[in-house]
Amino acid sequence: SKVNGVIAIDAEGSVDVKSCTFSDYTDVEDEYESALASGPMLLMEGKVCSFPQDAIYTQRMARSVIGITAQGKMMLLTIDGAITGNADGATLEEAAFIAKTLGMKNAVCLADGSSSTLWTSGKGVVNHPVGNGQYDHEGEGTVSTVIYVAASSLFDGGDGTVDNPYLISNRNHMRNMMSVVELDKTYYFEMTNDVDMTGIDWKPLNTGE
């Protein structure tokens, strides 16, 4: 399939999904700590990309997708396929439509067929990989590369009280403010660093005089 995208991770651990060709790799290397080239791109700035009409693009099959919302949130999507009557899969256009419906702004296709597997530490394989032809969780194929997502601290420190405010040093911490704020409660935050929020859509937490 066409490799025209990249999943890139910066020094703060923020993930970006963007269009990228071979000539752009040097710029990506300079800007990010880690990157994985993949493709094809499904969504760019909320718009469905155009695809060739080759069978690999128009055929319904299992798909794996990673995307970023307008707020910078990463989303992982696996579409089961090739199991008639249980999972028919998706064409690339259909996968792009699903990704957009879920709220992704930029999205790229990772893998198809039995390589499309989603695993969690609590439940193991949660989708139905097609490698064994059965609608179960045992048909995952062998792959050389995985994307591993681990939980990190919401902030650099603090507990949100006036004497021990949450410490914010990067844009991930800024986004995490929404995770802790509850109605009719007071929270305290302290900026410990200048934070570049370029390209991140803002959502107000509250309004006041």
Regions found by a protein language model. Give the residues of each.
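Gly/Ser/Thr/Pro-rich low-complexity, intrinsically disordered segments
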Residues: S1-S152
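Surface-exposed repetitive/solenoidal architectures
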Residues: S153-E209
